[in-house]
């Protein structure tokens, strides 16, 4: 919103203790505890007469963080010789939660998925991001697993959706100009209709991917997988943890 010229237009605060979560005056991020996997959601209450978004509600499940931590543990954990990277593993999990929160809040603001953003250096939080697992000096590295900022595409989306125009402006023409400017920056938009149906499999709309070339990324991630599996043993578990965990 700041990129669109609106300072402090978007703020996050703790819900007052006496507030009703169903109160339409409050946009809500709700934390839900789950013992099994479940989706996170970003939904809106919309005025059917005008399309105006009246209230946004995000639901984030607790199990996601545990799953991401276990993935990180399997990739970089080494409790036999070095347990100091526990904070790094938890940090990666929190980075994923941060990205997911922005993604679901984006939905409440009216933003759809954009699966082509991974081709453009993670240009949108509205993609389905695969953690960027890298190899450094022959070891798995998660320091750049998830982007920690709003993408350039997201800024253009908010500008397009929320910009106020001076009286007398040809709004349709002005909105098309914004799209042209975005395209001029090398940013594009491809969503579910381009990615999910069998007849709409655009080659750059893979879900959960990184990079420009699917073939090059497959070769890169296969090398990561090879090294990860070669080091996947009991060292990944804390002392005293059952193997069945």
State each model region's role.
Residues 1-108, 131-135, 159:
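Metzincin-family zinc-dependent endopeptidase catalytic domain
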Residues 17-18, 116, 122-123:
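Short secondary-structure capping/turn micro-motifs that flank functional sites
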Residues 61, 69, 75, 117, ...:
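Hydrophobic alpha-helical segments
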Residues 105-120:
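Catalytic Zn2+-binding segment of zinc metalloproteases
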């Amino acid at each position: 919103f700041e990129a669109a010229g609106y300072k402090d237009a978007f703020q996050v605060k703790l819900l007052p203790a006496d507030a009703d979560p169903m109160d339409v005056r409050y946009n809500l991020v709700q934390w839900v505890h789950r013992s099994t996997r479940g989706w996170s959601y970003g939904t809106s209450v919309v005025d059917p007469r005008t399309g105006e978004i009246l209230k946004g509600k995000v639901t984030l499940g607790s199990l996601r963080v545990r799953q991401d931590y276990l993935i990180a543990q399997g990739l970089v954990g080494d409790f036999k010789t070095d347990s100091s990277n526990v904070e790094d593993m938890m940090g990666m999990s929190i980075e994923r939660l941060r990205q997911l929160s922005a993604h679901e809040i984006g939905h409440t603001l009216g933003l759809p998925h954009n699966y082509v953003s991974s081709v453009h250096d993670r240009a949108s939080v509205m993609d389905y991001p695969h953690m960027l697992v890298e190899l450094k000096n022959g070891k798995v590295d998660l320091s750049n697993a998830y982007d920690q900022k709003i993408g350039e595409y997201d800024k253009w989306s908010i500008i397009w959706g929320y910009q106020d125009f001076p009286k007398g402006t040809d709004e349709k023409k002005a909105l098309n100009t914004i799209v042209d400017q975005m395209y001029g920056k090398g940013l594009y938009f491809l969503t579910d209709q381009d990615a999910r149906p069998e007849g709409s499999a655009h080659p750059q709309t893979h879900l959960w991917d990184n990079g420009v070339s699917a073939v090059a990324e497959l070769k890169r991630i296969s090398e990561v997988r090879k090294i990860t599996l070669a080091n996947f043993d009991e060292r990944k578990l804390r002392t005293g943890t059952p193997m069945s965990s």
